[in-house]
Structures are given as C-alpha cells and as structure tokens.
Amino acid sequence: MARISGVDLPKKKRIEYGLTYVYGIGLHASRKILDATGIDYNKRVYELNEDDIAAITKEIRASHVVEGDLRKQVAMDIKALMDLGSYRGLRHRRGLPCRGQKTKTNARTRKGKRKTVGAA
C-alpha cells in the first residue's frame, strides 16, 4: 500500500483517483501532479514502484499544501475572520451559515439540534 503525505492510498484504484484521498488534492491537482512526474493516469496504486512514489511525494511537497498544514491554514483563516469582526467571522462565531442562506427554517447542519424555546 502506497503511503503519501501520511495517507494510505487504496491499492486497487487508479492513481489519479487514489491521490484524491489526500486532503487538499482533488482530481485536477492530481492530474497536474501526475503530468509533472510523467506517471500514467491509468496506472493502479499497487503498480507504482518506490521511484514513482518518491517523485509524487517530492512534487506534492514542492507545489501543494496538504493534510495537516492545509487544515491549520484554513483554521487560521477562519480565526482571522473572527478576530477582524467581519460579517463572515461573526457568522462563524455564531455557528450560522456564512454564504447568505436563509436560516428561518433550514440550516440545521450549521445550527445543530433544535432547542425548543417557550411553552411553559
């Protein structure tokens, strides 16, 4: 099993889809990485040799922010919005949607379980 950026890639998948299991790498980025390293998209993960894995790892380290570093960066960006006091930061702080959705009836995912108010 190939291990790239701390993630075990599924053996039987094609490498272009296997790389998407790494947080921060989608299909487009996966194809760019494979183009840069010269590895065929249709190759399966179990068919990769050590040189291929090393080349992919080197390319990812050189040109992509992935896994823990990316999660940390996203968290810091959200924290910066909250510290600024921007509208998006306030919505994050209150646990409400940031992108303009209505909240009168929906938004249960962001708001969490219902809290009944009133009726004595």
Curated annotation (Swiss-Prot):
PROSITE patterns: RIBOSOMAL_S13_1 (PS00646), RIBOSOMAL_S13_2 (PS50159). Keywords: Ribonucleoprotein, Ribosomal protein, RNA-binding, rRNA-binding, tRNA-binding. It holds the Pfam family Ribosomal_S13. One of its GO terms (cellular component) is cytosol. InterPro entries: Rbsml_uS13_C, Ribosomal_uS13, Ribosomal_uS13-like_H2TH, Ribosomal_uS13_bac-type, Ribosomal_uS13_CS. The keyword tRNA-binding applies. One of its GO terms (molecular function) is structural constituent of ribosome. Residues 93-120 are annotated as: Disordered. Gene3D superfamilies: 1.10.8.50, 30s ribosomal protein s13, domain 2. One of its GO terms (biological process) is translation. Located at the top of the head of the 30S subunit, it contacts several helices of the 16S rRNA. In the 70S ribosome it contacts the 23S rRNA (bridge B1a) and protein L5 of the 50S subunit (bridge B1b), connecting the 2 subunits; these bridges are implicated in subunit movement. Contacts the tRNAs in the A and P-sites. Belongs to the universal ribosomal protein uS13 family. Part of the 30S ribosomal subunit. Forms a loose heterodimer with protein S19. Forms two bridges to the 50S subunit in the 70S ribosome. NCBIfam families: uS13_bact. This is Small ribosomal subunit protein uS13. It comes from Sulfurimonas denitrificans (strain ATCC 33889 / DSM 1251).
